[in-house]
Regions:
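Short N-terminal "domain-start" leader segments
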Residues: 1-15, 39, 43, 47
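Compositionally biased, intrinsically disordered low-complexity segments enriched
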Residues: 4, 15, 32-33, 53
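A short, charged, amphipathic alpha-helix used as a generic interaction element across diverse proteins
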Residues: 30-52
Length: 53
């Protein structure tokens, strides 16, 4: 999986994308708070891993 995280100053939000080049899955999101954005990423990774099991 590849995770990209960046801050969009114009919107005042942390944005992220998560892609899996093997399965072609892609998820994305945005939050104003960095910790909430990181939590969303972690929850999404855990969800995708559990789906594959």
């Amino acid at each position: 999986m590849q995770i990209n995280l960046w801050f969009n100053e114009a919107m005042g939000q942390w944005r992220w994308t998560l892609t899996d080049p093997i399965t072609m899955d892609m998820e994305s999101g945005q939050r104003q708070d960095l910790r909430e954005a990181m939590s969303d990423v972690a929850n999404t990774v855990e969800y995708l891993i559990n789906q594959k099991s």
